[in-house]
């Protein structure tokens, strides 16, 4: 794939981004390059249905951290689509919103992890999703591709060719680990952009209060 960006290809990267880190950014840039995407739109989730029983940091904080993390890349944008929407954040609703905005000619590419793709049959209105957009499944070195291939026959026939694999560098970074490190006064430098690190510290995010409740989310 050359450096020339094909018009009419837009990437969508959803996630809680609690907090956003270099793993997210590397994945988005790898997908943009490999699939010649015009841009990648980061969509912090509002109320993710798969995490309804887990505490998630206030959406405005996560949105601001995502803005800070993506500011240096002119091909990255951040959308308030899900955090301003009432109710649970379903991917099919987000894709429909971008389809209305960009029209029928633009190809939409939803970027996610390969592990998430393995659960795609449980997603709301999966048939509609696979008609409206392509999926880029980011794998790590050592990921067992046969797991994905075994699930492909269960997908709607017209959607099987819309799932693409891309291998990204093995960055052992997770939002869960970053939250744990902040809580336990461990360093998080080089795990996420410096501006995000400073935002976390200045807002007191991920630190427990004396009553055991996490400060601000």
Curated annotation (Swiss-Prot):
It catalyses: nicotinate beta-D-ribonucleotide + ATP + H(+) = deamido-NAD(+) + diphosphate. Keywords: ATP-binding, NAD, Nucleotide-binding, Nucleotidyltransferase, Pyridine nucleotide biosynthesis, Transferase. Pathway: Cofactor biosynthesis; NAD(+) biosynthesis; deamido-NAD(+) from nicotinate D-ribonucleotide: step 1/1. Signal peptide: none annotated. Pfam families: CTP_transf_like. Catalyzes the reversible adenylation of nicotinate mononucleotide (NaMN) to nicotinic acid adenine dinucleotide (NaAD). Belongs to the NadD family. PANTHER family: NICOTINATE-NUCLEOTIDE ADENYLYLTRANSFERASE-RELATED, PHOSPHOPANTETHEINE ADENYLYLTRANSFERASE. This is Probable nicotinate-nucleotide adenylyltransferase.
